[in-house]
Regions:
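Hydrophobic pocket/interface hotspot
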Residues: 209, 217, 284
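Short beta-strand segments that buttress and anchor functional surface loops
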Residues: 264-270
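Low-complexity, intrinsically disordered terminal/linker segments enriched in charged
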Residues: 292-308
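A solvent-exposed, acidic/Ser-Thr-rich amphipathic alpha-helical stretch
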Residues: 215-254
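Active-site-adjacent scaffolding segments
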Residues: 1-197, 205
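Short, solvent-exposed coil/turn segments at beta-strand boundaries
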Residues: 262, 280-286
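A short acidic/small-residue loop/turn micro-motif
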Residues: 49, 271-272, 293-296
């Protein structure tokens, strides 16, 4: 292989993989693109004569860039009490998530929210190993740790995920059974629950809602300067039902969509997106709801596939 041709010939072949890694590390599509661009700049300046596996080399580079970004973000956010949801990827209900390369090994919004609570090194170790099957002997050097220490970081991350509300430990290659659909049959069962929720909401059926919502459900709403009141985190079925009344008048404008490959719906009125809701379903109950109603963030989303 003539490695001097790598920057021009092969970087694009790895761009989608690198963006997928960065998105799961950062939960931000714009920051993921920035990290990938930085990897390209470093590749273009590097002497790659000794590089034998460009994909692994680039994965290491983009992971280090993401680690620096996470550490910088942690220092900025440590005093912030605002609700901040990760960037969602919104597609049509009839889309196959597998056809969207960035959604391979889909990580749902609910899991990304929990990943945002992890220390940067734990998040990196978990994402690289459990989602992308990178061995610990490659993860250790990225973190300036031994492979054994990297393994311990991933284990600690898994434990935090187990202890998070409505989350379970999951095997490598599927970062969250709760946050990503496990197949067409599983997705159909989830839609049955979501459709029942919408119907009960529109009819004001309190008992019907209680039957659908997990008693320990968590609702996170990022409202920004929108018309729905302040951003909130609410726990418990009765409390969530009370909060959901804020959105009830707009129920007739809700259209089903996939949010990171899992059920959700987008509220659109007169062609304008007003709110996006991602729903996590486990064992026939809704365990988490994440609502993005910040007008500035909604405007920035790529919704061309779902708003004609």
């Amino acid at each position: 292989v003539n490695t001097t041709d790598w920057p021009a010939a092969d970087f694009e072949a790895h761009r989608v993989h690198l963006r997928s890694v960065a998105y799961r590390m950062l939960g931000s599509l714009n920051e993921a693109d920035d990290a990938v661009q930085e990897a390209w700049l470093r590749l273009s300046r590097a002497d790659t004569g000794d590089v034998r596996d460009l994909r692994a080399w680039l994965t290491t580079v983009v992971s280090r860039v993401c680690l620096d970004m996470l550490r910088s973000r942690s220092s900025r956010r440590e005093d912030s009490l605002d609700v901040h949801l990760p960037d969602p990827i919104v597609t049509r209900v009839d889309d196959d998530p597998a056809e969207h390369a960035i959604l391979a090994d889909s990580v749902g919004i609910a899991l990304l929210v929990v990943l945002d609570t992890l220390p940067p090194a734990e998040r990196l170790a978990f994402v690289l190993h459990d989602v992308f099957a990178v061995p610990f002997d490659e993860i250790g050097p990225i973190l300036d740790r031994s492979p054994a220490a990297a393994k311990q970081l991933a284990s600690r991350a898994r434990q935090r995920l187990r202890n998070a509300p409505a989350h379970q430990a999951t095997p490598r290659g599927s970062a969250s059974a709760a946050a990503a659909p496990g197949g067409s049959g599983d997705l159909a069962r989830q839609w049955t629950v979501v459709d029942a929720f919408l119907a009960a909401s529109r009819e004001g059926d309190f008992e019907g809602l209680l039957a659908i919502l997990d008693p320990d459900i968590v609702l996170r709403a990022e409202a920004g300067a929108g018309p729905f009141g302040p951003s909130v985190v609410v726990r418990g079925a009765r409390e969530v039902i009370a909060q959901a009344q804020r959105f009830a008048p707009l129920g007739r404008f809700a259209r089903p969509v996939l949010v990171n490959g899992a059920p959700g719906f987008l509220v659109v009125r007169d062609g304008e997106p007003l709110a996006l809701m991602a729903v996590t379903v486990q064992d026939g109950k809704i365990t988490e709801m994440d609502v993005l109603a910040d007008p500035a963030r909604l405007t920035a989303l790529d919704l061309t596939a779902v708003i004609p």
